[in-house]
């Protein structure tokens, strides 16, 4: 199965394409769609067209995109939501099913910790996909989104939610084992 991950943004939208065969994940492509300093409709059109081009080039079976979070600045949140909407419209117009995950679900599925840093995300993406170089943060987040979906992001996020209850009991997970 081929998965297209999207990290939406009005100026820079990250994308990552991976193949999943059983438990094996393989890197296909990643990068960014950059919008010019133009009016909002033109930028949204660039995102839509960029997604459409990616679908034609890579023929994904599924896609995953980050849910919008509420920013301190409401205007930024609205603009991000519009960029996300343009990307989703491109995916739907291309006939690609869309799954949505929060940043917390993404980080728990890829790093195992919901408050992971951008650098930790990048390093885990490199390890999980056996990359020779470190992708930029937008591309890494998009690849992470695809990995999250491949690993059944919602299930992993739910399992990750068990960790706080274990911590209250003085237990934690270390190297796949419970320690106390």
UniProtKB/Swiss-Prot annotation:
* Binding locations of Mg(2+) 2: 66
> Where does it sit, as one GO cellular component term?
Holliday junction resolvase complex
Question: Record-annotated residues binding Mg(2+) 1?
Answer: 7, 138
Q: Does the keyword Manganese apply?
A: no
Please name the catalytic residues of this protein: 7, 66, 138
Q: EC class of this enzyme?
A: hydrolase
Lineage of the native species?
Bacteria, Pseudomonadati, Pseudomonadota, Betaproteobacteria, Burkholderiales
The primary site where this protein sits is: cytoplasm
Cofactor note (record): Binds 2 Mg(2+) ion per subunit.
The protein in question is named Crossover junction endodeoxyribonuclease RuvC
Q: How does it assemble?
A: Homodimer which binds Holliday junction (HJ) DNA. The HJ becomes 2-fold symmetrical on binding to RuvC with unstacked arms; it has a different conformation from HJ DNA in complex with RuvA. In the full resolvosome a probable DNA-RuvA(4)-RuvB(12)-RuvC(2) complex forms which resolves the HJ.
Listed EC numbers = 3.1.21.10
Which biological process annotations from GO are given for this protein?
DNA recombination; DNA repair
- Spell out the SUPFAM superfamilies in the cross-references: Ribonuclease H-like
Q: A Pfam family for this UniProt protein?
A: RuvC
Name its cellular compartments.
Cytoplasm
Report the sequence similarity comment from the record.
Belongs to the RuvC family.
Q: Which NCBIfam families match?
A: ruvC
User: What job does the chain carry out?
Assistant: The RuvA-RuvB-RuvC complex processes Holliday junction (HJ) DNA during genetic recombination and DNA repair. Endonuclease that resolves HJ intermediates. Cleaves cruciform DNA by making single-stranded nicks across the HJ at symmetrical positions within the homologous arms, yielding a 5'-phosphate and a 3'-hydroxyl group; requires a central core of homology in the junction. The consensus cleavage sequence is 5'-(A/T)TT(C/G)-3'. Cleavage occurs on the 3'-side of the TT dinucleotide at the point of strand exchange.
For molecular function, the Gene Ontology terms on record are: crossover junction DNA endonuclease activity; DNA binding; magnesium ion binding
Recorded catalytic activity of this chain's protein: Endonucleolytic cleavage at a junction such as a reciprocal single-stranded crossover between two homologous DNA duplexes (Holliday junction)
The protein's required cofactors = Mg(2+)
Q: Which InterPro entries match?
A: RNaseH-like_sf (IPR012337), RNaseH_sf (IPR036397), X-over_junc_endoDNase_Mg_BS (IPR020563), X-over_junc_endoDNase_RuvC (IPR002176)
Task: Recite the UniProt keywords alphabetically.
Answer: Cytoplasm, DNA damage, DNA recombination, DNA repair, DNA-binding, Endonuclease, Hydrolase, Magnesium, Metal-binding, Nuclease
Task: Please tell me whether the keyword DNA repair is annotated for this protein.
Answer: yes
